[in-house]
Design a protein with these regions (language model features):
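Bacterial Sec-dependent N-terminal signal peptides
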Residues: 1, 18, 30-43
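Short acidic/His/Gly/Ser-rich catalytic and metal-binding motifs that mark active-site loops
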Residues: 137-141, 189-196, 240-245, 288-290, ...
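Bacterial N-terminal signal peptides that target proteins for export
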Residues: 4-23
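Short, well-ordered beta-to-alpha junction loops that form the rim of enzyme active sites
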Residues: 133, 184-186, 236-239, 282-283
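N-terminal catalytic cores of secreted or lumenal carbohydrate-active enzymes
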Residues: 57-231, 263
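Residues that line or immediately flank small-molecule/substrate-binding pockets and catalytic motifs
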Residues: 94, 132, 238, 311-312, ...
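Active-site-proximal beta-alpha loop/turn segments in soluble metabolic enzymes
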Residues: 194-206, 239-253
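Substrate-binding and catalytic surfaces of secreted/luminal carbohydrate-active proteins
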Residues: 43-60, 67-74, 78, 181-183, ...
Length: 490
């Protein structure tokens, strides 16, 4: 892994196409002035960035474009005319422990970390998650109204968030002004639960409590927006199936969630004229029949739900949901947390799952811990992975392998991109490096260039020919590599 972030060769082709093209047939294109470049037609070009265990974010040359039929067994056929779902974006979760780690650094290093995640030159994250009250990487237990029996939410307050989470979000917005944020609670206020505690337990189902909780959400959206945060969506509960962990949780059944959404939350938002998307999430992916069908199958609730958030191994749930509820937005809201190993193998797994989930109609992807300290541990003792690790004692920044898993997507695939058809030849099946839905995906950005993402999980280099229409080019993917190729003018 790298302990300092390399300065990447600019390969993003949007906004200033010619001035930012890194390679044309493996050679560097020079321009005397931006205005001179803008007058020239865009020449067909390829920009390629690759990451391996020993060399992350390396610019590599592709072979010259050719109009001859491709040769060799490993042909990737791109069909930009066959399109699938739009892509809303990528990001991670804003957590209190992360901001605490960032603030241990001096101003220039703080800026480096935030730029690496949110600036156009970095991961370019535009779609992020935040907890409503304490999550498992908060500094301590808390909610936004801990006054028992305060059904009118008289004592509702986001003052704690104004000191920690909101400054974190606003610092990110300096580098990503269009940052969109969605909120989800791990636990309601403890007095609303059957066990009167943040961990474990279930939501009380009496009408006064449910009505108060709906008001809690409405006040939250309004307060965050007044504080300058673009909170575009809310989800009712993080992992409603779980109630046995040593961190904030709350159990709901699918039927209970539907009742809360239909009879309390949606009417309260309408009454308060709060125009915010309501999603069903965040659901552990294997629980589609138990949680998704009761809500989306309801004639009143279903049409008012903007999307679904799935966590962990989402591919079967994404595909099944798309087939049953076509056109519904879906977001991968969290992947495996692991235990702080931050290994290349885990990064390859995350990269593969991103390809898989997006190939099965997910519209976006949010990672869990963007930043942690060298302890990598929650307030309740759970050590986990992160994209960036900050050594708070030695003031050292480490960009972990999964940082590059995310960046290979988020730096190049822009909001509004569309997934396009990308297929490997059938004779690849069964080889050491098959192009399955876990190893190949492609998009067309709003500015027109094609973005092809390839994974070579094998231990040997893999020659590949990219073909789109009459154009083709050869690349050799390094062993154990993650790759992004940007094709302009094809």
């Amino acid at each position: 892994m790298l302990t300092t972030l390399p300065t990447p060769l600019k390969v993003s082709l949007h906004q200033k196409p010619l001035a930012q093209i890194a390679f044309i047939a493996g050679a560097v294109l020079g321009c005397l002035t931006q205005s001179a470049c803008s007058l020239a037609p865009t020449a067909p070009s390829i920009a390629w960035v690759s990451s391996t265990p020993s060399a992350q974010w390396q610019s590599l040359p592709a072979t010259a474009l050719t109009a001859t039929p491709p040769t060799g067994a490993n042909v990737v056929k791109l069909d930009p005319q066959t399109t699938y779902q739009p892509i809303d974006g990528f990001g991670g979760c804003f957590n209190e422990l992360a901001w605490s780690a960032v603030q241990s650094l001096d101003a220039p290093l703080q800026a480096e970390v935030l730029k690496s995640l949110f600036a156009e030159s970095g991961c370019n994250f535009n779609l992020c998650r935040v907890g409503i009250g304490a999550n498992d990487f908060a500094l301590e237990w808390y909610s936004l109204d801990e006054t028992p029996g305060d059904f009118a939410m008289t004592n509702f307050s986001i003052e704690r968030d104004r000191k920690i989470l909101i400054p974190y979000i606003k610092a990110a917005m300096q580098y990503q002004p269009k940052l969109a944020v969605w909120g989800v609670p791990w636990s309601p206020p403890s007095w609303m639960k059957t066990n009167n505690q943040y961990q474990g337990g279930a939501m009380k189902q009496d009408a006064p409590t449910l009505a108060a909780y709906a008001l809690y959400f409405s006040k939250y959206v309004q307060a965050y927006r007044e504080a300058g945060v673009n909170l575009y969506a809310i989800h009712p509960q993080n992992e409603p199936t779980y109630n046995n962990g040593n961190y904030p949780q709350c159990h709901w059944t699918g039927a209970e969630l539907n009742t809360f959404l239909r009879d309390y939350l949606l009417p309260q938002l309408k009454k308060d004229r709060v125009n915010v998307q309501v999603w069903l999430g965040t659901i552990v992916s294997g629980k589609l029949p138990e949680y998704v069908d009761p809500v989306l199958g309801d004639a009143v609730t279903g049409p008012q739900i903007s999307g679904i958030g799935y966590q962990y191994g989402g591919q079967p749930a994404f595909l099944a949901t798309h087939q049953k509820y076509p056109g519904l937005k879906m977001l991968q809201t969290e992947t495996e947390c692991y235990k702080g190993e931050n290994s290349w193998t885990q990064a390859q797994t995350t990269f593969s799952k991103m390809i898989n989930d997006l190939n099965n109609f997910a519209n976006g992807y949010t990672f869990w811990n963007m930043i942690l300290s060298e302890k990598s541990t929650s307030s309740w003792g759970w050590k986990q992975n992160s994209l960036v690790q900050i050594d708070t004692q030695n003031k050292k920044i480490t960009y972990e392998p999964e940082f590059y898993s995310l960046k290979h997507f988020s730096h190049f695939v822009h909001p509004g991109a569309t997934r396009i058809s990308a297929t490997g030849q059938s004779d690849l099946t069964g080889t050491a490096n098959p192009f399955t839905t876990s190893n190949l995906i492609a998009f067309r950005n709003p500015s027109g260039e094609l973005v092809v993402i390839l994974r070579n999980p094998g231990n040997d280099p893999l020659p590949v020919t990219l073909q789109s229409g009459n154009s083709s080019s050869n690349v050799t993917l390094p062993a154990q590599s993650m790759n992004t190729l940007v094709l302009s003018g094809w």
